Each structure stands twice: as C-alpha cells, then as structure tokens.
Amino acid sequence: MTTKYTIGVDYGTESGRAVLIDLSNGQELADHVTPYRHGVIDQYLPNTNIKLGHEWALQHPLDYVEVLTTSVPAVMKESGVDADDVIGIGVDFTACTMLPVDEEGQPLCLLAQYKDNPHSWVKLWKHHAAQDKANAINEMAEKRGEAFLPRYGGKISSEWMIAKVWQILDEAEDVYNRTDQFLEATDWIVSQMTGKIVKNSCTAGYKAIWHKREGYPSNEFFKALDPRLEHLTTTKLRGDIVPLGERAGGLLPEMAEKMGLNPGIAVAVGNVDAHAAVPAVGVTTPGKLVMAMGTSICHMLLGEKEQEVEGMCGVVEDGIIPGYLGYEAGQSAVGDIFAWFVKHGVSAATFDEAQEKGVNVHALLEEKASQLRPGESGLLALDWWNGNRSILVDTELSGMLLGYTLQTKPEEIYRALLEATAFGTRAIVDAFHGRGVEVHELYACGGLPQKNHLLMQIFADVTNREIKVAASKQTPALGAAMFASVAAGSEVGGYDSIEEAAKKMGRVKDETFKPIPEHVAIYEKLYQEYVTLHDYFGRGANDVMKRLKALKSIQHRPSSLLT
C-alpha cells in the first residue's frame, strides 16, 4: 500500500497552522501558518468605535475558516502529496473558545442585526469578563453540595462555557434568545467541514461540566442559578457528545474543493490543543505529566481512579486517551509573562546590546540569566500575570515580584519570572502527587521547550524530575493528525486506536533535562518561600490584589459613570 497521510490543523491564540503528517512514522512533510486577520479583539469591535470592557477577549470566526482554505492547500502544494493519499483531517483548538450560532450554524456576529453586539462574537479562552458568573456558579454549587464541583478542583473557571453563556444571558438577553446553540470553536470548525454539528467529549467534559456517566448538572441546579437557564443543557447545549478519535463526518465537496482535498475523507471530532499533544509525545499510560508550553501551560496526566485534586481544571473519563481518566491543570500565563517583560520591562540599552550581538532580546536575557546561580538574584515572583488557573482557580489574582534593589538587573528579573512559572508547575505536581495521582516524569511540548533550554532546566530542578521534550515542534497538530488517522481507520491506511498511532507516530528527543542535585536543594528553599507568598496572597489572608483590581475596574469606566 502506498504511504498514507493525514492533516492536523492547530488553532492557537494568534494563528492557525496546518501540518501534513506521514502516518508510517509521524514525520511532518509540510506545515503552513495563517495569522488570524483580526487577531485577538480586546480593545474595539472591528470597524467600529465600540470599546470592549475590561478583560474581554474576542475573535472573528471567519479567521478560522481562512486557515483551512489557506494553510491546507499550502501544505498540499509544498509536499507534493497526491490528494488521493490523504485519508483524513483533524483539528485542535484553544478552549473554552465559544460562540453563539443560529439554526444554520451561522455565528451571530455575521448577522447584520447582531454584529455590533460584542456578545455575538467568539469569546476567546482568555476572556475573563465572566468572573462574577463563575463566582456565583461556585457559590451555588457549594451551597447545594453538587457532586461535580470536586471534579473541577472545587472551582469552575470564568474561562469555561457556563460562565460565558450566563454572561451573555445577563448582559445581552436578545443574543441569548436568538442563539440556537452555544458551541466550542473546535466543534464549530468541524461543522464547517462536515455540514453537521458533532460535540466532542473533551471540551464537554473539561469546559462545560459534562460527565460521561452523569451528564450535565441537573436542570434544578441551573434553575437555582437563574430561572432562565433551567433548560440550557437540553436546548442550547443539546446534542450527542462523541469520544475523541471518532469520525465526525465526511469532508463536504465545497470545502474539499477550497482545501485541495478529496470530498468524503474522514474528519475527526474536535479536540483541545493541549490534549491533542499527549499522544504526540507517545504518552498513553499514567505517571507521565505532559506540559503543553506556550503563552500558557496546560498540564495533562492520565490516571486509573477518579480522585479529587485541589485546583485541577477537571478529570474526564476518556477525556485525553480512551480507557483512562484524563486529569488537567494549568497556568494562565507563562510565555506571555516573558513576552510582557521583554516588551514593557526592558531598557533600550538591552535592546541595543541584543542588536549588537545579532540575537533577539529573549536569547540575550536567557544567556545572561543562565550565568546566575539559583537564588543569586535575591528575587522571588508569583506567576499570576493572567490570574491563577491551578491550583487556586482565581482570575482576580495578579502578578508580584519581591526583592528589587537598585542593583537589580534585567536578566535577574527574567530568571525570577522563569523560576516563578516553574514554582507554579511544582505546586500542580505536588497537588496531584499528594492525592495519589502519581507524577514520575515530565514531558514538554510546544514553543517554549524548543527555544528556552534554561527554562527547561529550571523546571527539572524545581520539580526534581526528568523532563523529556517532544521531537515535533507541532505536537498539537501532530496529535490532531493522529486522531484523524484513527477516525479514518486501518481499512484505508490509518489506525484503529490512538495507542497504535502513538507507537508509530509519537516521538521525543534523545536529549533530556535531568535535575541538578545542588540546584534542587536551593530551589527547595525558594519554593517554600513561594508557597508562603502563594498562600498569603492567594488564599484570603491578604486580598490586596483583588482590591487593586476592583479599584482599577472602577477607574476603567467612562468618566460619565464615575459618580
């Protein structure tokens, strides 16, 4: 049989990427990136003077379609592969990135009567303006003793589906009423390829409080939140929920023509970017924590028993690999913190030095920071620049840096920020391990492990665990392509399980990062100081961060409202 291929399409925060994969060995033959034309919409609605509120983050749904019609033909052209040999396509997406659609699956923001209402647009994963709704959900769930709450670490996030839906209902009831279904973007883009809406078990479980055995929370719970929400799950969240690796449908002829593929090939059900990466590094068994590292980190771990772990984002049966419980935790900002510092916290002299040496500022700071010993800077940071996802699940927290002096240098700050993100991961590892969900080794994928060796060594030292790094630079896309091979099946040259696909296609580099014992000892002391700050500012002893944010929010309002 001739070699067969699938395509994985990875939808990130700023762009989408298509990768063409050889199913015999997981090698990437071609990849292409399409930046989102509208990017992240967080100031004004496109082509209007309508200003968005504090902590809003929207996107334009047609940017997602453009990825399919631009990047997929590009990888076909670059590779020279015959369309007859491409047997399937799979996608992964940021989550919870959601949108309201009408009866035809049309996003409401594309309808003339709703285009000027921000609530009709795609709400990106990092839209945090529904925090008050998340707080109310958590309070009600705790008051009623809802069984689902411990499965999400005791708190539902403002980033997730129900909080965002409730915000729409409360602030734009006309949009809510016009909505036929609220969809994850990953399910919506699959529907654009297949002509039918199929919902995946991953986002339903991790982002919409769905349980394989129990379903959604009861109508009574939703009625207690808001009587208008009573029938939400049987109306606007209705539909069958399908396991990962299943075939959502065949590629529509009109989309096939635009994408340069054959109509009818398998389209896998949607997936989440981070979760798709797990089999791409060959992980299909427990004890191995996979970190998808980029602007943020998503931590994923397989287990055999359902345990309650503080601050986990969820535990979902078959949520990552069929046959296991999939645990998820995360950090809301990692690469974003380093990028923020380089953009806003570095002097012109540092930029000049980088230019003279012919390197970028990140590389210069990494090189200088690598010459420092652990603890040498005298600095300690809390990595909450975009709130805390795990283990505190609180978007109202903010970043902190302690220990500045007049002698503090940029590279010292940079290293302290790297260390802070490692401490955040250590807190997550300890939370899992302490509840019997064992973590023996770490796997890293995404952009950061490929670029920043110092960061990976610090993570190994702080967690005192060996770290293996993905051989692929595009692990979510590779994982999406692997699930596409399962959706296609062995009869046409694919695989019959994700475990089979992972054995052939999942890969890690030969080089690993091992803990350095003398560094481990120093970082243990620093980590204990981190825990002290973490608990003091994060568990209610001093809510100064929240008070500052509240004051900022008041001052952010138009002057006419400041009375």
UniProtKB/Swiss-Prot annotation:
UniProt keyword list: Arabinose catabolism, ATP-binding, Carbohydrate metabolism, Kinase, Nucleotide-binding, Transferase
Please name the Pfam families in this protein's record: FGGY_C (PF02782), FGGY_N (PF00370)
Pathway the protein takes part in: Carbohydrate degradation; L-arabinose degradation via L-ribulose; D-xylulose 5-phosphate from L-arabinose (bacterial route): step 2/3
What's an example of a GO molecular-function annotation for this chain? ATP binding
Please give the catalytic activity noted in the UniProt record: D-ribulose + ATP = D-ribulose 5-phosphate + ADP + H(+); L-ribulose + ATP = L-ribulose 5-phosphate + ADP + H(+)
Q: What is its EC number?
A: 2.7.1.16
Q: Which GO terms describe its cellular component?
A: cytoplasm
> Keyword Manganese, does the record have it?
no
Matching entries from InterPro entries are given as: ATPase_NBD, Carb_kinase_FGGY, FGGY_C, FGGY_N, Ribulokinase
Keyword Transferase appears in the UniProt entry: yes
**Gene Ontology annotations of biological process type:** L-arabinose catabolic process to xylulose 5-phosphate
The record, for HAMAP family, names: Ribulokinase
| Record family assignment | Belongs to the ribulokinase family.
Protein name, entry field: Ribulokinase
